[in-house]
């Protein structure tokens, strides 16, 4: 069995880690960074960029640079939270044929799972480069408050990326694993996790290697991106007041504002004032316009105060569900880049009544926890037991559109529960089971996960047939539902696939596309390598010809010059095979030149050695007389 890696698939940044012996280790990417921006860009020449290279070109290619796609994963296009994002991102969010929110770039539409798969592929390649072996299994983290559709979509992303996802693990739980491993601590901790796009809070009991989640709560559409967008809105409004130009209509300006807002937000965590300076942000008939503005920490905190306060209600609910007061929490662990913001730390301290623990790296701790869980599954990490919970209640729609819960929220998983229902009409021969997830009393107000029919029920008065509905949640938090007619033994079951979601055939198609893209990327990389090698060969040959061309015959020199001209011509195109062939021809033709250079060097070395030997022969040995000190000592009187 190869290595199982742990991946934190984040909204803003992603991170990959692996167990190195008994210790988890974060792996640096090709750019030497420990985290990778969760950004994918498609360039004009059909190249796909992921991570830092994608982020670097975002300003000049805003419509084809996709970021924060995790906020769309497993969501419907008509979801109000999607509508909110649609106006704020420079790329296009479109409605897929299944009603899900997808993204469009370069005339093609991509599912959020596909875009996430490109990021996961980058994580996979990062791990493979470090380990020197193929990696095809992973533990991937998701926000604790992700519903079934979002978990399934994340698992699909792993499959498209060529990874077998052994476990989907909740981010706060992963952070608790990283915090609690190798610590002899016992007690109840709260993990406050405010990342780039999601917020979670989990209450856990830790002791003797057992990590038991007591409750979890959160908001899957609240994170650093919202703080950035709030600042973008403020900057755009101020500029419009001053210049009368709405920057929201300019995709390029919007992307520059987004980058400036993120930078200012980060700076204000360590300084009380920053300056935002964006020259040539736009232009009108009177000429170019510049945006220059000073922003204080106090002003920024006032702009986002409601977002900060929004994190407190989930904390309150999580404590209530766990049956605990804030005073009974022994430690509060901060996770996610947003927790570096002083205002967040202050609010957490006020609510829990204690200084939060800042001893973990908020950007890396989740990936480290995922690697530990990978180690547990591989058998490398012993004596660790993780007991997680389902974040939302699961149930079915019953008569009158009521949501009847079968599994309550915060139930430890894996779990299996059954309940018996009956028919609503006389002689009813089929029932439709509609499955929902959520906390509202009416089914329609909750998240519809899917539906299926149980057919062939024998005719009987209403209320007589006994239909047993069973919910089975696995360790990934993914749901299976079955319905059985107890009289006939007939059973119907489904692995929940949201009314949206990706079908098996769609996933297979995307897997094949990803493999084809990987092959295409490899070809493109080989072409770049061939060009680089050819450029270096041209340079070295020209230099050698200039310095040593006179040492070879006229015919040999002409052969080298012709091969050089052919290679230069080939370099004007993109045919890597032609470039390789012409490079080989030039290398062969240049061999005589190389021989002449080496011969000259050998002759020079021989002459130098001869000169040194002659110099040695001319050395005169000095004559000396040994003096015996004892004989020279005068005897004392």
Curated annotation (Swiss-Prot):
Entry annotated with the keyword Cell cycle: no
Induction: By stress conditions e.g. heat shock.
Molecular-function GO term, any one: ATP-dependent protein folding chaperone
Amino acid composition bias (Basic and acidic residues), ranges on this chain: 605-619
Modified residues (Phosphothreonine): 198
UniProt keyword Chaperone present: yes
Record's compositionally biased regions (Acidic residues): 620-630
PROSITE patterns: HSP70_1, HSP70_2, HSP70_3
Function per UniProt: Acts as a chaperone.
Protein name: Chaperone protein DnaK
Lineage: Bacteria, Pseudomonadati, Pseudomonadota, Alphaproteobacteria, Hyphomicrobiales
